Design a protein with these regions (language model features):
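Intrinsically disordered, low-complexity regulatory regions
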Residues: 1-106
């Protein structure tokens, strides 16, 4: 029996390390794509992201820059002994991975 993409990704996550982190980002992308596509069961690899990134590389650069600023802000907050109120470092790192992946897949 052939394993599904999600099952393969979950297996990679369970193994940990760098491949597990990338797989975790892809799983997050799959779940979020359900929210961004009106709950339709669309293959996340087939989603047209041009409306989200209308200015090509500039749009991707802006989003990656924004996420990097958030990451740096959260690190500073952590160094000051404070916790994030919402999405933390791991969530922001996963977003950065996915936005970089969107750029590479364009």
């Amino acid at each position: 029996m052939e394993a599904s993409t999600v099952e393969l990704l979950e297996e990679l996550v369970s193994r940990g390390g760098h491949p597990g982190a990338i797989a975790k980002a892809v799983l997050l992308c799959i779940k979020k794509s359900e929210d961004y596509n009106h709950g339709k069961n669309i293959n996340p690899h087939d989603v047209d992201r041009s409306e989200y990134f209308p200015f090509g590389a500039v749009s991707y650069a802006q989003m990656l820059h924004t996420k990097a600023l958030r990451f740096n802000s959260l690190v500073q907050k952590q160094m000051d002994g404070q916790e994030s109120n919402f999405e933390g470092l791991d969530d922001t790192a996963l977003d950065i991975i996915n936005y970089a992946g969107f750029y590479l897949a364009r």
